[in-house]
Curated annotation (Swiss-Prot):
Matches recorded under Pfam families: Urease_gamma
Protein name, as recorded: Urease subunit gamma
Assembly notes: Heterotrimer of UreA (gamma), UreB (beta) and UreC (alpha) subunits. Three heterotrimers associate to form the active enzyme.
Entry's Gene Ontology BP terms: urea catabolic process
Domain of life: Bacteria
Gene Ontology CC annotation, any one: cytoplasm
Pathway annotation: Nitrogen metabolism; urea degradation; CO(2) and NH(3) from urea (urease route): step 1/1
Location of the protein in the cell: Cytoplasm
Amino acid sequence: MELTPREKDKMLIFTAGLVAERRRERGLKLNYPEAVAYISAAVLEKAREGMSVAELMHHGTTLLTRDEVMEGVPEMISDIQVEATFPDGTKLVTVHHPIT
């Protein structure tokens, strides 16, 4: 299977997001890379489902709470930017202060 660099990046985000999702479901607190992957993967999936950029910017802030991540992680993540594929093309989605 031949994949472009962009497709490889999306596969890596999806895989890391899946690992983070499983750890979260088991009650483990997510570290920095897991939290970023979890939110990024969720944004990519919702974009494919047709959610707008504005909706995704808000949705990204509802995915994780301080109680679900390790100490200090919320302060480390001020913004997450994901290049997502929408029905009308690719757009950059920025989620500001994603962990409440």
